[in-house]
């Protein structure tokens, strides 16, 4: 029985962010490919000069109030307790990827208020 693309997308949509990351790593190893975008020539450098519109929220350190940071990660990402704890314990770790500046700033503020050290990339 062969799965349709829609069934595959639906199944992936039901996974947590960490489960999707693990799936991507497994696919990279199985098929010998990477999910990285190939670098373009000089045109890519010109695009970098433009204002950045999407940001990644990187948790660099959990700080003293780890429980509060786990709660903040859960609220921001919708992850379960176990997954959020894994993100916090695995610091430095990506909390949110490719979000708008406003959302990234709010996430950074919430995490810093909880006691974490955060970087926007």
UniProtKB/Swiss-Prot annotation:
User: One of this protein's Pfam families, by short name?
Assistant: Ribosomal_L12_N
Q: Which UniProt keywords apply?
A: Ribonucleoprotein, Ribosomal protein
Cross-referenced InterPro entries, in alphabetical order? Ribosomal_bL12 (IPR000206), Ribosomal_bL12_C (IPR013823), Ribosomal_bL12_C/ClpS-like (IPR014719), Ribosomal_bL12_oligo (IPR008932), Ribosomal_bL12_oligo_N_sf (IPR036235)
A GO biological-process term:
translation
Which cellular component, as a GO term, is one annotated location?
A: cytosolic large ribosomal subunit
Is the Ribonucleoprotein keyword given for this protein? yes
Q: Does the keyword Ribonucleoprotein apply?
A: yes
A GO molecular function term, named singly, is: mRNA binding
> Which family is annotated?
Belongs to the bacterial ribosomal protein bL12 family.
PANTHER family, A to Z: 39S RIBOSOMAL PROTEIN L12, LARGE RIBOSOMAL SUBUNIT PROTEIN BL12M
Under the heading HAMAP family, the entry gives:
Ribosomal_bL12 (MF_00368)
- Please describe what this protein does: Forms part of the ribosomal stalk which helps the ribosome interact with GTP-bound translation factors. Is thus essential for accurate translation.
Q: How does it assemble?
A: Homodimer. Part of the ribosomal stalk of the 50S ribosomal subunit. Forms a multimeric L10(L12)X complex, where L10 forms an elongated spine to which 2 to 4 L12 dimers bind in a sequential fashion. Binds GTP-bound translation factors.
Protein name (record):
Large ribosomal subunit protein bL12
State the gene name recorded for this protein.
rplL
């Amino acid at each position: 029985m062969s799965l349709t693309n829609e069934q595959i997308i639906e199944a992936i949509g039901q996974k947590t962010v960490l489960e999707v990351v693990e799936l991507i790593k497994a696919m990279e190893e199985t098929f010998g490919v990477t999910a990285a975008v190939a670098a373009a020539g000089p045109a890519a450098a010109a695009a970098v000069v433009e204002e950045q519109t999407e940001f990644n929220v990187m948790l660099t350190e959990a700080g003293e109030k780890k429980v509060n940071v786990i709660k903040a990660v859960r609220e921001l990402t919708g992850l379960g307790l176990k997954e959020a704890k894994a993100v916090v314990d695995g610091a430095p770790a990506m909390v949110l990827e490719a979000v708008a500046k406003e959302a990234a700033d709010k996430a950074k503020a919430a995490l810093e208020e909880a006691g974490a050290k955060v970087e926007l990339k």
